[in-house]
């Protein structure tokens, strides 16, 4: 079942993650905090990649849901089209264009850079 997510693409943070990824567990809380403390709830999208929906739901049940958008890319179509190398990986999208890629887990320094340099 393929559904579209309508978002304002003027500024989006897309995080690719998987339930089996230990580094994804660590950055999950950082992304939720980033979204909730910077009024970015509709701008942060966590996309489960290289995983299935059951494992993704179990991950979120174990580690919590934030007030952000969650999606599952079971076919890897979005990730492949976006040039994702693996998980975790985070893309900053401004006006529909990927302007920055963070390959590997985000840290506090990356979060500060996002807050200070992007809308």
Feature locations, PLM:
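A short beta-strand-turn-helix
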Residues: 1-12
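Cofactor-binding loop segments of dinucleotide-utilizing enzymes, especially the Rossmann-like FAD-
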Residues: 16, 47-49, 95
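Short, conserved active-site loop motifs that form the nucleotide-linked donor/cofactor pocket
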Residues: 42, 68-69
């Amino acid at each position: 079942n393929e559904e579209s997510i309508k978002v304002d693409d003027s500024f989006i943070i897309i995080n690719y993650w998987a339930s089996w990824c230990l580094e994804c567990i660590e950055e999950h809380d950082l992304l939720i905090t980033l979204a909730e403390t910077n009024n970015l709830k509709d701008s942060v999208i966590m996309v489960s990649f290289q995983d299935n929906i059951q494992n993704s739901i179990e991950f979120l049940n174990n580690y919590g849901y934030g007030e952000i958008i969650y999606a599952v890319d079971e076919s890897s179509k979005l990730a492949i089209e976006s040039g994702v190398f693996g998980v975790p990986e985070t893309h900053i999208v401004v006006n529909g264009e990927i302007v920055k890629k963070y390959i590997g887990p985000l840290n506090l320094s990356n979060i500060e850079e996002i807050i200070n340099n992007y809308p």
